[in-house]
Structure formats: C-alpha cells, structure tokens
Amino acid sequence: MKFRTIYDEERPAPVLECKDESLCLAYQCTETSIEKLVKLANQNPSYLHAFAGDPTRQPEYGECPSPLDYQDALEIVARGEEAFYSLPANIRVNFSNPMEFLSWLEDPANYDEVEKLGLLDPEKVQIRKSKLQKDQKEEVSSEEK
C-alpha cells in the first residue's frame, strides 16, 4: 500500500465539480469588493450615506451595551415559543407563529377578544378597564375647558 504525500507526481482528481449555472453576477464583483468600498469611503465619507438613505446623518461609532447577551436572548425566544405552543390548538390555529400572536396581543383593538379567550388575568383586566375609563373622563373634561 502506498501513502500519498505532497511530493507525489500524481495529483488526486477534484471531488467537487459544479456544473450548474452560477447565481453570482460577475459585473457586481468590482462594485462589492470590500477593498473598493473602504477606499471609496475613505475618499468620500458621504459615499456611505447613499446606503443609509439620509445624507445629513453623521456616522456614529461606539459600543451598544445591552443587559442581554446572545444566550439570554435565545432563552427569551425559547420561553415565548414554549408559551405559544402551550396554548390550546383552537387559539393557535389563527396564528402562524408566535410573533404574529404577540403582535395581535399588543394591538389594543383586540383587547376585548383577548379577554373573552381568557388569556388575561381578571384582576389586571379590571385595573386596566378602570384606568382606561379614568383616562377617557380626563380627556372629556379637558376638552370641555
């Protein structure tokens, strides 16, 4: 048995042969080169504003500290999905994913339906209703003045 080395005359044939049509657009090669983009940005900083959409906006640099790290964010998403999938099927069937359900819950127009489905704590419902009534009374009294 012979072992292959880097000094062998005989080279192994390539294993991967891509004969499909390429999805890359060759003319974009020079436009999207990182070296070219950095060079253009150094020559003319306003070049970057074309990508941002606002020519008056100044670039901002710095860290954005967050109390959450990636693992915490993943756990929050997992808990949200778990809560969504623990709902009864007759409620879940109206929503294709947890995000759609959450946006529906946050819409004030759906508040009565959320209450009818029993998804809210009855005590919190009463507190919210009394607060809304109080706010409406204040608006009416301020409009009368």
UniProtKB/Swiss-Prot annotation:
Its main location: host cell. It comes from the Viruses. Keywords: Host cytoplasm, Viral capsid assembly, Viral release from host cell. One of its GO terms (cellular component) is host cell cytoplasm. Coiled coil: none annotated. It is found in: Host cytoplasm. Pfam families: Chlamy_scaf. The keyword Hydrolase does not apply. Participates in the assembly of the viral procapsid in the cytoplasm. Released from the procapsid upon genome packaging, possibly through affinity displacement by the protein ORF8, or by proteolysis. Belongs to the microviridae B protein family. This is Internal scaffolding protein VP3. It comes from Chlamydia phage 1 (Bacteriophage Chp1).
